[in-house]
Amino acid sequence: MRSNQYSRESIFCIIFFLFFLLLLNVNVYSQYPEKFDSLGPTVQSLSNNNKIIYFIDDGKVTDKPVVFIGGLGTSVRAIRLLDFLRSYREELGLRLISIERNGFGQTPFNPNFNMNTYARDVIDIVNHLDIENFSLFGISGGGPYASKIASIIPERIESIHMAATLPVFGTKERCIEGKINNIYKDIIKYPMKYFGFSGDSPIHQIDGFQDTAYDEAARTFYMNGQMANIEPLDHELTLYCNEGVINTESFSGSLYVYAGTADPLIGDRDIEKWEKYYPNADIIKRIYTGEGHDVQYRHLDQILIDIKYKKNELLVCKNGKNLLLNSDQLNHSDKYQFGLCVWQDSDI
């Protein structure tokens, strides 16, 4: 009887195992994709007042809207350089919107357009998307455009996030004969030189980032047949001087500043002057010792958190764990690494 019982149990186990393999096999062959993988956000267009505005709207309509303004001489698709944290951004519920500037990418060059023209383009796009209030995220040469927008519609701006940029570009020291010297004029025909990062930049930890930056530079200066025409870039540098000091006294919301102390384009005095030009804003500064002109990417995780929560909380990695701490919770005797733990080769 006992041997018969074992035989029945063995047979049952064999049948169950074969049934499991059958199900597994069926599952393998039934997992066909229900949609295509994304190759990045689609560039859309809006015809308005005899001109075409090119823009990207990346996120759900229910997400928190953020107008992203890329650096000097970038196209609407510079937004792709933020996609290495796209999944995290989606988890936070942030909707990124980018509007292309005059003469770059797909947008024809018009020498009569100025910074106010771009600000109106941004307003037209957010109105078209039925967005009332939104945050601004400006990096490097995009910072003055963010200030211009805030000066025109301060009541619609929930927060401003300025990374690797200056409170004022158009100073007397920088403006010579009405424009800033174009140090890029001889290299824009070489996208790999224009948008190349130094070998020690942390962005090289991100697969494909540098190549995406090369593609962005090529798109900016060749996409619409520009053939590396220097005029749009010269014009943009002139606009900084034409604007000079942008009056942002009417903005009273939160302003977050992100800067590296080793950034060759930003000095200590520049970092100190934000209060002067945003006298009524609630200013929070994130200063990163020894870091350069790539904090907008290295600390994108912190920027996204600030846009979402608008608090003074710091994202740190300690002992392999991601922690979000209030500034007064930081124990300065402990070893923290700012940002997500994924940035680290080893836990601290």
Predicted regions and their residues:
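The serine-hydrolase catalytic nucleophile loop
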Residues: 72-85
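Conserved alpha/beta-hydrolase "acid-adjacent" motif
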Residues: 264-270
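Catalytic active-site module of serine/aspartate enzymes centered on a nucleophile-bearing elbow/loop
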Residues: 281-347
